[in-house]
């Protein structure tokens, strides 16, 4: 049975890695598939946090050279590097403030399958709306984002604290609304994910460190590696995809997933 739980952890790790950076809500997928395969981890919330950490580290690895260049440029006084670093900080700040104030409310009240399903469907409608508008894309390079655009993306990210919204979905759509091209919005979403998810993961790991035991470390480790590998496959593919296609296919997928979760919650006792 323990080996079977490891296989389940491997599967959910891949699910996390495949869905974290797509605008389709990794939370919704983990709730649904975790219920379907009846996965139980003594690590609970820590398992989810660590596999999310695996996904974000994949982005750090893929963009490592750009990150290194930005850091070097920042400390050497390069204006563009400093501008971009400040832009990420501006976008990151609203999530820090709202997250600290609302974390208990979000986890105790909003974290339910019904909320996730509704957020998936509403998010899909917003994607359809944004894609139907002809916004003037003033910025085609993520590193050229303005401070105003960064703030708008940061505020959009706060909406993603509602489970099922999708952090990547909110920030990509928010970026497009602010005047970024689809590709620039996607790449800025990746960079914003780094401090946001690393910060959230660190906070949750410290808060739940007592549940990390030798009994659940294998499941957590397997899930981490699976999420890392899956995210490596998705990130570059997503950038190539959004250069040529709209986000409408993800919107349709969100509606289907939202309806499935609603049905499962009402008739099959699906729980978060």
Swiss-Prot record:
- The enzyme's main class, written as a single word, is hydrolase
Q: What is its EC number?
A: 3.6.1.27
Q: Which GO terms describe its molecular function?
A: undecaprenyl-diphosphatase activity
Answer whether the UniProt record assigns the keyword Transmembrane helix to this protein: yes
**Membrane topology of the entry:** Multi-pass membrane protein
Subcellular location per the Swiss-Prot or TrEMBL entry: Cell inner membrane
Q: Which family does it belong to?
A: Belongs to the UppP family.
* The protein's role, per its UniProt record: Catalyzes the dephosphorylation of undecaprenyl diphosphate (UPP). Confers resistance to bacitracin.
Stated name of the protein: Undecaprenyl-diphosphatase
Gene assigned in the entry: uppP
